[in-house]
């Protein structure tokens, strides 16, 4: 099975190592997911948005090219090819201002384009969108935040799942959507961090083949991930 992981953090995947002032717990979680999936024999492809220098801005040239069935930015075309080849998609990012960082939103805007990853059927009854990613069997979101999980769900009303699941992948017909949230990141101990990373690795080692697997059900953690380490 081919797993595509999209990491969005300015420090890049290199910050997975626990080096003061150059570390990111988001990157450490992403690296643990990669290790687990690879240990299970899955092919793992990593898109490191910051390392690639990906721009989240949809330009006028992008829109003109899209209307002509073309792509201006070769990086966008490369991401689209890799997405179409994926059986399971994983996003890993910190939560800023209660939402994903700009590069992840730009990935949705510029890469998940109509005519490439989904089609729209004018006049269709019900949902007019059709999934053009037949291999993609599931999406897992790994989010890291300082906000308490309960506050995020009940006070802010879960904006991440509304945007990514209900408003994006669910809308175009992708099933098996899973969210793993690591809250209160700055208040966790080194032992809690280690346990969290070990559990994340086991979760993705248990990723089941066929229709994109289901790491949230197969792994050792529940829907939320309460154990984290300092630094988003």
For each predicted feature, which ranges?
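Structured loop/turn residues at beta-strand edges in well-structured enzyme cores
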Residues: 84, 102, 134-137, 175
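Glycine-rich phosphate/pyrophosphate-binding loop and the adjoining helix
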Residues: 151-232
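Short, structured loop/turn "capping" segments at alpha-beta junctions
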Residues: 114-119, 174-177
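N-terminal beta1-alpha1-beta2 submodule of the flavodoxin-like/Rossmannoid cofactor-binding fold
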Residues: 1-116, 198-232
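A short, flexible beta-alpha/helix-coil linker loop
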Residues: 9-13, 145-150, 184-187
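Short, glycine-/small-residue-rich phosphate/pyrophosphate-handling segment
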Residues: 119-170
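Functional cleft and adjacent loop/helix regions within the main domain
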Residues: 69-83, 129, 147, 160, ...
């Amino acid at each position: 099975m081919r797993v595509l992981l999209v990491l969005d953090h300015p420090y890049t995947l290199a910050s997975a190592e626990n080096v003061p002032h150059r570390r990111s717990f988001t990157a450490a979680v992403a690296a643990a997911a990669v290790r687990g999936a690879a240990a299970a024999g899955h092919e793992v492809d990593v898109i490191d948005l910051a390392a690639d220098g990906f721009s989240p801005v949809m330009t006028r040239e992008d829109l003109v090219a899209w209307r002509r069935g073309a792509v201006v930015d070769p990086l966008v075309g490369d991401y689209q090819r890799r997405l179409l080849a994926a059986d399971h998609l994983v996003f890993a990012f910190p939560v800023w201002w209660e939402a994903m960082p700009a590069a992840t939103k730009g990935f949705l805007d510029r890469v998940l384009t109509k005519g490439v990853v989904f089609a729209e059927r004018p006049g269709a009854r019900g949902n007019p969108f059709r999934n053009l990613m037949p291999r993609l069997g599931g999406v897992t979101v790994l989010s890291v935040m300082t906000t308490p999980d309960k506050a995020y769900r009940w006070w802010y009303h879960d904006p991440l799942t509304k945007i990514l699941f209900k408003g994006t992948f669910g809308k175009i017909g992708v099933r098996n959507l899973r969210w793993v949230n690591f809250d209160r990141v700055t208040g966790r101990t080194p032992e809690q961090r280690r346990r969290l990373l070990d559990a994340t690795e086991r979760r993705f080692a248990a990723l089941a083949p066929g229709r994109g697997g289901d790491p949230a059900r197969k792994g050792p953690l529940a829907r939320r991930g309460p154990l984290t380490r300092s630094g988003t």
